[in-house]
Amino acid sequence: MYHIELKKEALLPRERLVDLGADRLSNQELLAILLRTGIKEKPVLEISTQILENISSLADFGQLSLQELQSIKGIGQVKSVEIKAMLELAKRIHKAEYDRKEQILSSEQLARKMMLELGDKKQEHLVAIYMDTQNRIIEQRTIFIGTVRRSVAEPREILHYACKNMATSLIIIHNHPSGSPKPSESDLSFTKKIKRSCDHLGIVCLDHIIVGKNKYYSFREEADIL
């Protein structure tokens, strides 16, 4: 049986969410907000508690049918449909989060993806890929867009988003509008600079990839500096 811990004090879920944040509310409080109202002889928190008491764990909540929900006094067709819609949306959000976190297995894999995105760009784009402990992408962020003559980005800007995303590793990618991925001296200098900054914060700089027209250069594959 799913364990419910009821509080003695009067609960005002909406006000508590505003004051404390959604993560501080109990499961029955969150469900009560979705249900909105109870019935004359049963407050909404009592209804939400009864729903949760009908399942062995929160993971089973999504398995409740419309008929099972409607068998609970205070839950009619409208509320049961709203609950099922909320559960389906939550499932789709979870799937979208998982799909977004593509796992990077090699520099070549990422380079091929980025050649499609940046290979034909007329301006230089500097992109950072932030990853978790399993090399799954947390965020892909364009740090800078500039001309061939001016494409400077400070490591602190790159690392700001690494810290914000709680990333454990990152890969830097930029394109050469000329189509040739051959690194320049400034590319080499920047790579060393970003690696030093990452090391200082305990973030792993896995690679710096330069993409051109159907070609790429990986500092990890070609140079002994990462």
From Swiss-Prot:
A molecular function annotated in GO for this UniProt entry is: metal ion binding
Task: Locate the motif JAMM motif.
Answer: 174-187
PROSITE patterns from the entry?
A: MPN, UPF0758
Q: Which GO terms describe its biological process?
A: proteolysis
Q: Which InterPro entries match?
A: MPN, RadC_JAB, UPF0758, UPF0758_CS, UPF0758_N
| Keyword check for Metal-binding | yes
Residues the record lists as binding Zn(2+): 174, 176, 187
Write down the Gene3D superfamilies for this protein, in alphabetical order. Answer: Cytidine Deaminase, domain 2
Fetch the NCBIfam families from UniProt: PRK00024.1, radc
Similarity annotation: Belongs to the UPF0758 family.
UniProt-recorded name of the protein: UPF0758 protein SAG1101
Which species does the entry assign this protein to? Streptococcus agalactiae serotype V (strain ATCC BAA-611 / 2603 V/R)
